[in-house]
Structure formats: structure tokens, C-alpha cells
């Protein structure tokens, strides 16, 4: 494999030591985005979805307006 992801340990294919994540809507530059960062803008009667600061996933909001 010639082009390794900068966040990925090429042997384990997991985040390198000191890095939090490899990819995802709440991952940037190998780190989780801050809690409260919008990861999915509201549409229609839905509300924004926000990063938690502990995961690279974008959890669905639990509330509807």
C-alpha cells in the first residue's frame, strides 16, 4: 500500500498513537471535533446534529422542534 492515511498506523490500520480517529463527520486532522460542533445541519422540522467530542460519529439529535 503506497498511500497510507496520515492518521492510520499502517500495520494495525488503527489510529496512530496520540491520535483519536481516522475518519468520520466528527474527525478532523486525526482528532475528534469539539463537543457542540455541528456535524449535520437541520432540514425541515429537524434540528442540527452535534459532535460529542468523544467519537468520530455524528449522533442523531434526540429532539424534534
UniProtKB/Swiss-Prot annotation:
SMART domains named in the record: DISIN
Major location category of this protein: secreted
One Pfam family, short name: Disintegrin
Tissue: Expressed by the venom gland.
Keywords: Cell adhesion, Cell adhesion impairing toxin, Disulfide bond, Secreted, Toxin
InterPro entries in the record: Disintegrin_CS, Disintegrin_dom, Disintegrin_dom_sf
GO CC aspect terms: extracellular region
Record-annotated disulphide pairs: 7-30, 21-27, 26-51, 39-58
Residues spanned by motif Cell attachment site: 43-45
GO biological process annotation, one example: cell adhesion
Domain named Disintegrin: residues: 1-65
KW Secreted (keyword) present: yes
Family note: Belongs to the disintegrin family. Dimeric disintegrin subfamily.
Subunit architecture: Homodimer; disulfide-linked.
Locations listed in the record: Secreted
Stated name of the protein: Disintegrin CC5
GO molecular function annotation: toxin activity
PROSITE patterns: DISINTEGRIN_1, DISINTEGRIN_2
Upper lineage: Eukaryota, Metazoa, Chordata, Craniata, Vertebrata
Cited function: Binds and inhibits integrins alpha-IIb/beta-3 (ITGA2B/ITGB3), alpha-V/beta-3 (ITGAV/ITGB3) and alpha-5/beta-1 (ITGA5/ITGB1).
